[in-house]
């Protein structure tokens, strides 16, 4: 399996592909009912508007996840934000999505490792406790990538992992 990650900003085809699966991504998030994500079709909330904001943010690293060079997912990496009592991490995973037909094949885990190696530094990943699939995925992927060398905090309905990344990390496998 050949997994790669590329900059989505350089390809109009990648942007169109992300636009084509964005509704599926929001459908995955809808059951969380956090109030953060717009209800599809609501007046004033349109998928293209959300994506336009992503692409307008010069600090956002929008990535296309590929299997054998074909798009199968996307990720968005943003600069970290400080939290009370802690300095800001270098990076945070703001969005991460693998299309349904490509899940549970190891593509997501491989893509995460490529992204973490590409953006070396202090990371934070956050999931909602109401999303047990995401919590399980990120705990597994981060534990494997860091070989258990990460911190996790659970508060206010969120799980946050912080850890260091970089290509010098030795992972199992």
Predicted regions: what they are:
Residues 80-93, 103:
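A conserved beta-turn-beta hairpin within the catalytic core of GNAT-like acetyltransferases
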